[in-house]
Amino acid sequence: MLIKVNFMEHYLLNKQFELASAIKSRNKILIHKLVSDVLVSYNSLCYAVYKTLKNSDDKSSSNIQKKKKKKKNFQNLVDSLKCFVLNYDFYKIRCLNLYYLRNFIDCKDQFLHFHFLDIALQNLYSFIFFPFLESNLDKFTYGPRVFRSSIDAVKVLFLLGKQKKYSNYNKYLFCFAFNYTIVKCFDAVFNSWVLSNVSFIDKSILSFWVKNGFDNFYSGDQFFFQKKNFEINRGTSLIFLVIFNFVFMGMQFFLESSILSKFGFFSKFVLITDLNSVVILSSDLKTAKIVKSSLLIFFHSRGICQNFRDNSIVDFFCKNCENKNFVFCGITFHYKLIHGEYKFVLSPILEKIKNVKKKVLNLCKKFSKPLVLFDNIKPLMKSWFNSYKIIKNNYSFLKLSYWIVGKITKSIYLLYVNSNFERGKFGIRKGRRSGRLYKNIAAQVVKRLYFLKDQQRFFINTIEGKIIFKGFSVGLSKKNSIELKNFFSNSLKGKKFFATFGKNFF
């Protein structure tokens, strides 16, 4: 069963229309009320930022006049924040004027555009709508951070304006900061929470992003990977889409417990979001409707989705459904008649992934010689590549390639170490195995993985010539390092690629 609930878009649009009509009628009371509804969190957050930036002045025990001046400067900041309107075309929020923050940063030439700060605060504040950290929230803390608040992130935005090397990026400062700085502000506490509470999204991919510092961009159903740099990148940051899905996992646990306590039964469901709407995946209609009503109550209690349109909630349960397919977050859901009932099923690509994984597992268990295993894996991978070219689902292929590289490499490595197949070649002597043996084994494993050559999903460091395995690293000789560099494409030079192997790798 599947339900789609549009919440954030309609709330912002309604606020925009109400504010526009109030401005036309010059109703100052209504304008002040509408603006204060959205800015209720901005005031305390800006005051916290102001106190943080002026912490050195606070320590000085002199001058009551300085304190009065600070309050006046803070009031100017609040007044300027009230001069914005919600705009759907510009990330749903835009300032009417620009405000020079020379009172808050010790710089005469540099300044920040206030629409950039508004967007940053709006995105950071949106995390308060989710329940998994409500017990840890206070008036100066917003977002999924336990021991640190989003004040740190906003403070970084202020400090960016005083650095001369970013002066050319004032026009695009929002894109730069959110693709590089804000993502970096999420600390290890939040990352550990995500990795321990996510069940349906690949943990290894997020762990890979966190450890290696990749920027990820989402465009339609295409996933792109690019090393972090100081260039302005176009597109919406995928990390926020992933984090929002993780946050909705926290909401899912919250709803599961509340449904169990209220209705006395437990039924599994999944919430997926694209930052603008929510999809509820459930096994039966009863659970889906209960989850939908619980979500509406949850959103209403936080002041969003107050006025739903007729088409803001879409139910996909009618037998005469015109939409045979439904695409959401790059995943295609097919509406089919199964055992007399119309149900949504996942796209065939996911079923094919399950079959490929089963075959790979069987092959890894069946064969005891590395070369025989490679010979049997090749035709399986060729068939998978052919189907991938037709379907063109990069996300599914990425997850499968991660899993295959980890599984096959680990299996082959253990075969090389534990079997008698390579004893004569590497000259294994009794007792402790030498480091030279591990180097040769690592080189042989990487050489034989040539069927994934063009995908660049490997775990090598071409600078230091190391291969990272489970629990330890293997250093390669100069000769083997040169062979590795020739083996991979030139675009891999100077970049680090690591992989870890665990029980929950995929």
UniProtKB/Swiss-Prot annotation:
One GO cellular component term: chloroplast
Highest taxon listed in the record's lineage: Eukaryota
Localisation per UniProt entry: Plastid, Chloroplast
Presence of the UniProt keyword Plastid in the record: yes
Alphabetic keyword roster: Chloroplast, Plastid
Principal location: plastid
Family the entry assigns: To group II intron maturases.
Protein name, entry field: Uncharacterized 59.8 kDa protein in psbD intron 8
Source organism: Euglena gracilis
